[in-house]
Swiss-Prot record:
Protein name in UniProt: Uridine kinase
Domain of life of the source: Bacteria
Transmembrane segments: none
Pfam families per record: PRK
Pathway(s) where this gene product acts: Pyrimidine metabolism; CTP biosynthesis via salvage pathway; CTP from cytidine: step 1/3; Pyrimidine metabolism; UMP biosynthesis via salvage pathway; UMP from uridine: step 1/1
Entry binding sites for ATP: 13-20
Family per record: Belongs to the uridine kinase family.
GO MF annotation: an example: uridine kinase activity
Reaction equation(s) it catalyzes: uridine + ATP = UMP + ADP + H(+); cytidine + ATP = CMP + ADP + H(+)
Taxonomic lineage of the native organism: Bacteria, Pseudomonadati, Pseudomonadota, Gammaproteobacteria, Alteromonadales
Species, as recorded: Shewanella frigidimarina (strain NCIMB 400)
Stored PANTHER family: URIDINE KINASE
Amino acid sequence: MNSQQCVIIGIAGASASGKSLIAKTIFEELCRDLGTNQIGVINEDAYYHDQSHLTMEDRVKTNYDHPKALDHQLLASHLTQLKQGEPVSIPCYSYTEHTRISDTLTMQPKKVIILEGILLLTNPKLRDLMDASVFMDTPLDICFLRRLTRDVAERGRTMESVISQYKRTVRPMFLQFIEPSKQYADIIVPRGGKNRIATDILKARIQHLLAK
């Protein structure tokens, strides 16, 4: 597989803005056309730095909404390898342990790779590897309510810890890094991941790139 056959789409935006939903929708619908082995999804969260050398107390203090919390260099390297037709071993991150675990996920080269993550568009190397980029422009108060529900139900968090983190890092980092990165997006999607018109436009763009 050569580099022209690997289309990389980046979907960025605030936490709980609808990135995963639109990525899942596109994945499922393109699978019907391309086959399940030809499209994959990579979550930026998998590339949080390994913190196994830190105590749990110190891990909890990490600012996970700052670009420095993520190993974007490794992610860029993996994307380059996939474009070159080489498989990669994607890290697995534990939200309850606040670090990587020993397991990895092997991804084979794909025709389409969908990236999703809050800080993808802040990194020039990642932007250069993308064939198209998307920013989910969902109101921050809606994102917060969704995040609160998700993190308590799915990630073993307490309501108090989610609210504290939102005040301490999530909102400030959104304003400092995530929202300004919107300027780099090719497509800005309002109203969250259920925006059908935006989904169809993005699918059409992917199909156009594949046809080149």
